[in-house]
Amino acid sequence: MADAIEIEEMMLEDRDIAVVLEVPTRRRRSRERDYRDRRDDSYDDRARRRREDSTDSWSRSRGDENRGQTPRSDSGAKVHDAPKASAPAAQTEEQKKAERLAKLEAWKKKMAEDKERKEKELAAGGTRKLLDDIDQKANGSSSQPSPNTPTTPSTSAISGDLAPTNYAGKFDPKAIAKKAVASSSSAHALGRDLPLKELSKTSATLTSTVKGLQADKKPTAFNSTSKVSALPKTRGNLSVFGLGAKVTDNEKTYQKRALDFDEDEGSRKKLEKLPTLPMANSKEDDAALANGIEGQDDDDDAELEAAGTEEEAAAAARAAAEKREERLQEAESQPHTNGDVHMEDAPQADSTAMDEDEEIDPLDAFMEEMGDPFSLPKSNTTFVKNNTKSQPQEPEALFGDDDVDLKALDADPDEILAIANKARKKKDIPTINYANLNLPPFRKNFYTEPAELVDMTEAEINDLRLELDGIKVAGKDVPKPVQKWSQCGLDVKSLDVIKKLGYDKPTSIQMQAIPAIMSGRDVIGVAKTGSGKTIAFLLPMFRHIRDQRPLKNSDGPIGLIMTPTRELATQIHKECKPFLKAMGLRAVCAYGGAIIKDQIADLKRGAEIIVCTPGRMIELLAANSGRVTNLQRVTYVVLDEADRMFDMGFEPQVMKVFNNIRPNRQTILFSATMPRIMDALAKKTLQSPVEIVVGGRSVVAPEITQIVEVREEKEKFHRLLELLGELYNADEDARTLIFVDRQEKADDLLKDLMRKGYPCMSIHGGKDQVDRDSTIDDFKAGVVPIMIATSVAARGLDVKQLKLVVNFDAPNHLEDYVHRAGRTGRAGNTGTAVTFITEEQEQYSVGIAKALEQSGQEVPERLNEMRKSYKDKVKSGAKKESSGFGGKGLERFDAEREATKARERKIHKLNGDDDEEEKEEKDDDVLLKAASVVQPASASTAPPKLLGVPKGIDLDGDIKVHRTETAASSSGSKNPLDKVTSAIDAINARLNKTGQLRSGVPIDNKGPDAGAFHATLEINDFPQKARWAVTNRTNVAKILEATGTSITTKGSFYPAGKEVQAGGDPKLYILVEGDTEVVVTNAMRELMRLLKEGTMAAADAEGRAPASGRYTVT
C-alpha cells in the first residue's frame, strides 16, 4: 500500500500547480462520472482491461481518505491523491516537452516498423497468419510478469525503467485491441494454457504499474463522449468478486473473434461482428489522449490510422459483398423478359463496388473468396444458383409469376365433350391372350360308368328316362342316367354331406346332369322350378376343384358361377357352405349394392369359388388394373338362369367375362325356361354340349294348382284379402308371395295391407341390398308371412312353407309366369298360384294360356277369348307380339344418359362470353317455337324428339297467343256480336263434345278479370319432375314478378292410359293470361324452358337408375 502511495506522489510532481488546484473540483466531477459510469453498460474489451487497472488501484488506495479521482473509463483511468505530499523538484516546461516529443517519436518509429512488418507478412503469409501473430504477441506481452514496483522515488529512474516496457505494449493500437481477448483466444482458439483469472490479475498489475505515465493534463478530455460512447462504463461497482463475470465477458468476446477468423465454413457466416473502422479510430484517439498530445497534424493522424488498414479493407470487402447481394436481389425482383437469370452479372457488381482501387488488393481478393459463403444467410437462392450454373434455368419459371405462358384451352364443346366422355369411360377388363400362356392342363372327366348301367340296353334307358319325368337328351355320347348317389362318382366327403342334408336320392335333372358334367361335357340343363338344379352343378364343381393344385397368393378362383339377380347369388352361396366346410374350400359372393372393399378383401385372401352377378364381376376384374383378381385359373363356369343371362340385357357383360376365361373351360348352363330364340346365343359359348330337358321347356310343375281370374283393377285388392283370409284360416304358418309389376305399386300395396292388419314387407330393385337381404331372411324365417315383390324375386327364391303365390299384376311373358308360379310347390310339395288379369292386358293372355295348356290344366273361357282376340289383332297388324326377350341391353342406358347430359350442357351455358350469349339467343328462338296449343287426342303428330315428351305435345312448335273472347252483350249492336256469339258457341260445342282443349282456348277464360291475351300449355302427360318444375310456387313467383302475367293451373290429372270422359274436366294444363301479347309470350317461354329442363332431368334420372323408383335420390 505504501509503495502505491509513493508512486502516486511521484506522479503528482509532474503536474503543474493549476492541475493540483483543480483536484477538488475534478474529484466531485469524477464522482459524478463514476456514478454514471457504474450505471452505464457497455462491453468494449479494451476499456475493460483498463478498468481492471482502475479497480486494482482503487482497492489499494481505498483506505486513504484523501484518495484521488475515480479512474476514467475512457482513457485508461488516472488515479491520484488530493493532498500535497513531499515530492522532488518540479521539472521545467522545456524538459517535459522534450520528454513528450521523445516518447512520441519513439512511438511513431515503432508504429512505422510494425506497419512495414505487417505488410511484409501479409504479402508472405496472408491475413490469417498476421492475425495469429498479433494475437500471440499480445498474449505474450500480457502474460509476462510485471516489473516490481520501484522503491526509489526517483522520477528519472521510473521514467527510464518503465518507458520502454510501457510504450512497447501499451500504446500499440492493435495490441490494445487484442489484449482484451488474449486470455480467451489463447485458451480456445490458439491453444494456450494460461488460466483466465491469472491472466487478468497479471494485466491489472502491469497496468497499475504504469499509471503515472498515462496521465493526461487536460481535464476537459474526460468530457469527450463522442468517440468513446461505445466503450463499457460499468466499472465502479466491480471488485475482486467481479472478476469471474469479467472472464465470462472475455470468453464471449473471444467467441466472436474466433468465429470471425476460424477456417470452419459454418463459423464464417457470423463475420458480421468484425471490428469496424470507427472503433479503430476510437482506439487511436484514446492513445493520443493518454499521451497528452494536442493538435496532431494530418500526417500524424494518417500514421495512427495505418494500424487499422487490414480491418478497414476487410470491412470494405464485406460491405461490397453485401451491396452486391442487394443488387442481385433487386435484379431478381424485377420482371425478366425471358425468365432466364444470367449468373455472369455477379462479377459486374464486384467491379462496380471496387472502382476506387485500380488494382485488386490481395487482401480484398482473399476476402472476396470468403464472401460467397457469407452471403448464404442473406439469400439461399443465390447460393443454389452459384452451384447450378451449368443446369438449365427453366425450373425457375415454374416458381415465379414472370413471363408465364398461360394458354387457355380451346372452348370447343365437341372437344370438351370428348374429353369428358373419355374421363368417364369405364375401365375395360385387361385382355389375356391365352395362346401365349403356358397354362397347366387340368382334368375334366371324373366319371366311370357303374356296372349296373353297363349292361342296360338302349330301350331300357329310354324307358328309364321316360319314367324320370320324361327326360329328353340331345347330343353325342350322352351318359346314362344314374339312380342313386353312389353311382355319380363323387368323393366320400360330398356323400357324407349329402347324407347329413337328408337327400335320399337324386332328382330327375340330377340323375342325368351329374353324370354328364362329371364326364367333362358342356351341358345345357332345363328343368322345372324346384327340381334341384343347383345341387346338380355344385357337386361336380367340388370334385373338379379338389383335383387341381391349391391356390397361390396371386391366383384367382377355379369355379365361377354367375346369376342374373343378387338374391339368387346369395342363395347359391348359402347352399355351398355345408360342402365348403367339409372340403376345406372357400367361396366369395360378389354382387352389386354391397360394399366392394369387403368382397375385394375376401378375394385377396383366396377363394376357389366365386358366386357373382356379371356387373360386379366386371368391376372386380377392372379394379386396380386387374390386380384384384383374375380368371386365368377358371376352368369351371356355371350360368344359372341362362336364358336371362344370354338376353340382350346381360349378354354383352357375360361375353366380356367369357372372353377372359381360358378357351378349354367346362361350361354349364341351367334354367327352368329356355326359349328357342336363346339356343343360338347359348350354344355359341359351348363345345359339343349335351342338352337335357326334364318335363319340357317353360313348364309349370304339376304340383302347382294354377288359378287365373279376369278382374277389374279395383276388384283385385278385395279378392286378395279373400285369398289371404282363406289361407291363414287353414294354415297360420303358411307364407304368401305377391308379385307386382312396378316398384311404386309394391309400396302402395304394402301400405294397404298394413292398414288391414296383415304384417308384410316389400322387396324390389329400388331398395338397398341390405334391406333386400334382411327382408328375404325375415320372410324365410317366418317373421313376416307376406312378402310383396317385383320380378327380382321370381327366379331362384326357395322358401319353405310358401303355399300361395299371387300375381297381382299379370306377368308380361311366359317364362316370367313359369318362374313366378314356380316359387311354390318346390321339392315335391304342393302350392297354389293365382293370377289376376284385366281386360286391358289381353296381350299377356297368350303366355298364361299356353302355360296352363303345357301343364295340363284347363284354360278359363274368358282367358281363351282374350287370347283369340289378341291373336286376331296380331294377324291384322294392329298389335305386335313380344316374347319377353331380346331387350336393348345396358348400352341403351349409357347412350340415353350421355344424350341427356349433352342436352343439359347445351341448355345450361355459363354467361360471360359473346359466343355463348349468341348461342343462348338461338336457344331462346328455338323455345319461342315451342307449342302452347293442346292438340286433340286423335290428332296425328310427329314422334317427340325429347325423351319423356308425351304424344300430342310439340315443344318445337310456335307459341300461339290468343286474344280473349268476351261474352255477348244484350244491349249491343247485332251485327258484330253475332260473330262473337257464334264463335263462343262453337268453342263450347267442341269442348262439350270431346272434353279436350282446342286452339289454346280454356273453358273458363270468360270472367271480368280475364286478361286481354292468353295461352295454354298441357302438362298432364309430362313426367312428374317436369310438372313440378312448372307448378311449384318458387318458379311461378319468379315468372309472375318478371312478366306481370297471371298463371293458373287448371284441369285434372289423368294417369297414363286413362282418357277424359265426356263432360269431365280436361287434362291438367297451365293458363297464362296477360295484358299484352309480349308478356304472355315471355311467360310461356319461361314455362316451356322449365318444362323442358324437368323432362330432361326425369330422363337422366331414369337413365342413371333404370330399375329404381321412389327410393332413388336424384
UniProtKB/Swiss-Prot annotation:
In this chain the Helicase C-terminal domain maps to 703-867
InterPro entries with a match to the protein in the record: DEAD/DEAH_box_helicase_dom (IPR011545), Helicase_ATP-bd (IPR014001), Helicase_C-like (IPR001650), P-loop_NTPase (IPR027417), PRP5/DDX46/KHDC4_KH (IPR056149), RNA-helicase_DEAD-box_CS (IPR000629), RNA_helicase_DEAD_Q_motif (IPR014014)
Gene3D superfamilies for the chain: P-loop containing nucleotide triphosphate hydrolases
- Please state the Enzyme Commission number of this protein: 3.6.4.13
Q: Where is this motif: Q motif?
A: 483-511
Family annotation (PROSITE patterns): DEAD_ATP_HELICASE (PS00039), HELICASE_ATP_BIND_1 (PS51192), HELICASE_CTER (PS51194), Q_MOTIF (PS51195)
Compositional bias segments (type: Acidic residues): 295-313, 913-924
Any single GO CC term annotated in Swiss-Prot or TrEMBL for this entry: nucleus
Pfam families (UniProt xref):
DEAD (PF00270), Helicase_C (PF00271), KH_12 (PF23469)
Locate the compositionally biased regions of type Low complexity.
141-156
GO BP = mRNA splicing, via spliceosome
Domain Helicase ATP-binding: residue ranges: 514-692
Q: Which GO terms describe its molecular function?
A: ATP binding; ATP hydrolysis activity; nucleic acid binding; RNA helicase activity
UniProt motif (DEAD box) ranges:
640-643
Keywords on this record? ATP-binding, Helicase, Hydrolase, mRNA processing, mRNA splicing, Nucleotide-binding, Nucleus
Where is this chain compositionally biased, Basic and acidic residues type?
A: 31-67, 93-122, 190-200, 257-273, 320-330, 869-882, 889-902
Catalytic reactions of this protein: ATP + H2O = ADP + phosphate + H(+)
The residues the record assigns to binding ATP are 527-534
What UniProt notes about the protein's domains is: The Q motif is unique to and characteristic of the DEAD box family of RNA helicases and controls ATP binding and hydrolysis.
What is the stated purpose of this protein?
A: ATP-dependent RNA helicase involved spliceosome assembly and in nuclear splicing. Catalyzes an ATP-dependent conformational change of U2 snRNP. Bridges U1 and U2 snRNPs and enables stable U2 snRNP association with intron RNA.
Q: Which family does it belong to?
A: Belongs to the DEAD box helicase family. DDX46/PRP5 subfamily.
Q: What is this protein called?
A: Pre-mRNA-processing ATP-dependent RNA helicase prp5
Q: Which organism is it from?
A: Sclerotinia sclerotiorum (strain ATCC 18683 / 1980 / Ss-1)
Gene that specifies this protein: prp5
